[in-house]
Regions:
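Short beta-to-alpha loop/turn elements within the nucleotide-binding domains of ABC transporters
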Residues: 209, 221, 227, 236
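Short alpha-helical
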Residues: 108, 211, 222, 239
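Flexible, glycine/small-residue-enriched loop-and-beta-strand segment within the central core
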Residues: 81-90, 95-207, 236, 244-245
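Terminal amphipathic alpha-helical/low-complexity segments used for targeting or macromolecular assembly
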Residues: 1-73, 158, 164-165, 171-177, ...
Length: 246
């Protein structure tokens, strides 16, 4: 491949030569093992939709066979969407609400979730050849989207994320006109959020914008640059309007 071109997960999954069945295994299961495919199909098709206490018990019992790790006290709600679950680790006392998506497509992708985590209804953690790492005591509100594309997203401990927040690492390059932007090698820097951080409703955090320890990010802010420790930031783009130390 031309050194100026970036090979995406989509390239890997849509390339010629592999059968549709093999591509399905790569996208959904993450391995071409037939036994892993059968296990994935049975558990996600039969156990995932079951509501109530019976569904909770069955998922708690059988989903350990899918994930790389599930800690003690974990609760998984119905209609969990899983992609490549053997690259996903859940710590102790994790609560996944209804309709959560955990997607670890791409050979280098991993999702690592710490202890005492709440992921709200309809929220999605998605990787593309990178890693999402949540520390301990993290609350992710409903309808949030956290995406790691070619660079990691790492959240510290005691982080609160309001509903409808979007955190996405990875940037396209648009310098070359002769190469489609999605094929160009961007300079993905990743996103790091420190400890004891409050992120309000509907915040957007873009690649390379790190948030320090103890920060407060106001609702609807768009964070495009680094926010120092204990700063209070708001606006579009986000600017510092105060400090918790004052």
């Amino acid at each position: 491949m031309n050194n100026n071109l970036h090979k995406t997960v989509m390239d890997e999954l849509t390339q010629d030569g592999d059968s549709a069945f093999r591509k399905y295994q790569d996208i959904y299961v993450g391995t071409r093992s037939i036994s892993s495919l059968v296990k994935y199909e049975l558990l996600t098709s039969l156990v995932s939709p079951i509501p109530g206490a019976i569904g909770f018990f069955l998922r708690r019992l059988f989903y350990k066979k899918l994930f790389a790790k599930i800690g003690d006290g974990t609760v998984i709600g119905p209609y969990l969407t899983l992609r490549c679950p053997d690259r996903i680790s859940l710590g102790n006392n994790v609560f996944l609400d209804d309709n959560v998506t955990l997607d670890a497509k791409g050979e280098e992708s991993h999702i690592i979730v710490g202890d005492s985590i709440l992921i709200g209804k309809n929220s999605s953690l998605s990787c593309s050849s990178s890693e999402i790492h949540l520390g301990n005591n993290v609350s992710v509100g409903s309808n949030c989207y956290i995406r790691a594309s070619r660079a990691p997203v790492k959240l510290g401990s005691y982080v609160t994320i309001g509903a409808h927040t979007v955190i996405i690492s990875g940037n396209p390059s648009y310098k070359r006109l002769d190469i489609p932007m999605m094929k160009q090698k961007g300079k993905a820097r990743g996103i790091a959020v420190g400890n004891d951080v409050w992120i309000g409703i509907g915040v957007k955090v873009v690649d390379g914008a790190n948030i320090g320890n103890g920060c407060v990010i106001g609702a609807g802010a768009v964070v495009i640059r680094n926010i120092p420790d204990y700063a209070i930031a708001a606006g579009v783009p986000a600017r510092i309007i105060g400090s918790r130390k004052d």
